[in-house]
């Protein structure tokens, strides 16, 4: 079981949700990865917290450009993740 979310993680997840609901529908689907960068960001923040989760999210967004092939890029297992990948 993952630890409770910090206020910082909650705030960043809320910002990503605003993007998903208000901005992303206007831009249309253009993410090169599965899961999408915004879904990846939420999962990374939940698994790793605000510092490492933010770092993983920024790295992922920087890879999302036309010169990168994209594809399947899941969030790495977290310290409390007991599922096998």
Curated annotation (Swiss-Prot):
InterPro entries: Membr_insert_effic_factor_YidD. It comes from the Bacteria. Keywords: Cell inner membrane, Cell membrane, Membrane. Its main location: membrane. It is found in: Cell inner membrane. It is a peripheral membrane protein. Pfam families: YidD. One of its GO terms (cellular component) is plasma membrane. Signal peptide: none annotated. Could be involved in insertion of integral membrane proteins into the membrane. Belongs to the UPF0161 family. This is Putative membrane protein insertion efficiency factor.
């Amino acid at each position: 079981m993952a630890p409770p979310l910090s206020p910082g993680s909650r705030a960043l997840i809320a910002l990503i949700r605003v993007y998903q609901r208000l901005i992303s529908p206007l831009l249309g689907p253009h993410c090169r990865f599965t899961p999408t960068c915004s879904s990846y960001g939420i999962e990374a923040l939940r698994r790793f917290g605000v510092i490492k989760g933010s770092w993983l999210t920024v790295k992922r967004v920087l890879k999302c450009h036309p010169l990168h092939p994209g594809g399947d890029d899941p969030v790495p297992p977290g310290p409390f993740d007991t599922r096998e990948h």
